[in-house]
Amino acid sequence: MGEAQVYGLEITPHAVRSLKKLKRDRALLRRLDAAILSLAQEPRPPGCRKLPSRKFNNLYRLRVGDWRILYAIEEDRIVVIILDVRRRDQAYRDT
């Protein structure tokens, strides 16, 4: 049996700013961090959804409660790029 491929993780400055705004809600931040880290092992986990986008070929979203992690997968570089973390009502603008 072969080992599962581990993807690298990159996080955009915009996503970092979004996460910093949540620093008061430590429980939510822990859940989001765990979900982001799990994408390195499984970039297409159950419940993720591929989104249509003009900017990215492989744009996905992952639900974490009322929040959405928006990310792209670059298969040629074996990397997951965290683009943003948004509340559900804001998640699908400008993708």
Region locations from a protein language model:
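Basic, amphipathic "hinge/linker" alpha-helix immediately C-terminal to the N-terminal HTH DNA-binding motif
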Residues: 11-15
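Short coil/turn residues that cap or connect secondary-structure elements
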Residues: 23, 27, 40-43, 55, ...
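Conserved short hydrophobic interaction patches
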Residues: 35-38, 88
